[in-house]
């Protein structure tokens, strides 16, 4: 199957090259996560804070402690784990109770982002299945075409959430005044990843998002989107405020959710 990304139409990325780039991003991510687990194991709870001098936590001990707390008998306000997963983590009911608009923004970003990630995982699974010689009723290229519609749908859902976030940061005074540089970097990164995906697809297909750009630029545009997605959406997470997408669910599960 030919990939859309490349330096040019004649120099498109291969499966092995895509896997190497992905592996690099995953290794950087895992290294950062181990560091975060060590800090949390040492009692650090704030973003960008370091453990006290001479104190070093254990990633394994942190995970064991967290899992023990998740499995511990529920305290008075605790909720069943399945309820916490569905209502507190997926549907984010805590945010909904505080602000419906903010909830809609968060939910569209979360649902769009995670759905696109899941679709990418399915695409990877189909490619790997073919590589190991298992025959499927469709080729990877045909499966990619099947995923095009849901990719568009969830891409636009993500875009709606991102645009709401941009408008809030720019024009809602209390949100703008409370924003710090980390917030702008996070939002800017998500915006660039989202828009670059639409533009890369638009150049290739000739739809409105192509803005009349030469089709020759389609492979480099797709390559830019692929690389920045791997860097920002995977490798950068443990080193940024974006770590809250992992830390918050862990804390909610450990506390058994609820209000």
From Swiss-Prot:
As for membrane topology, the entry says:
Multi-pass membrane protein
Reaction(s) this enzyme catalyzes, per UniProt: methanophenazine + coenzyme B + coenzyme M = dihydromethanophenazine + coenzyme M-coenzyme B heterodisulfide
Would the keyword Cell membrane turn up in this protein's UniProt record? yes
Pathway(s) this gene product operates in, as recorded in its UniProt entry? Cofactor metabolism; coenzyme M-coenzyme B heterodisulfide reduction; coenzyme B and coenzyme M from coenzyme M-coenzyme B heterodisulfide: step 1/1
Q: Which InterPro entries match?
A: NarG-like_domain, NarG-like_sf
Between which residues do disulfide bridges form? none
Q: Would you tell me the Gene Ontology cellular component terms?
A: plasma membrane
Its GO biological process annotations read: methanogenesis
Q: Where are the transmembrane segments?
A: 15-35, 104-124, 147-167, 180-200, 218-238
Any one GO molecular-function label of the UniProt entry:
metal ion binding
Listed under subunit, the entry gives: The dihydromethanophenazine:CoB--CoM heterodisulfide reductase is composed of two subunits; HdrD and HdrE.
Question: Additional info?
Answer: Methanophenazine seems to mediate electron transfer from F(420)H(2) dehydrogenase to the dihydromethanophenazine:CoB--CoM heterodisulfide reductase.
User: Can you say what this protein is called?
Assistant: Dihydromethanophenazine:CoB--CoM heterodisulfide reductase subunit E
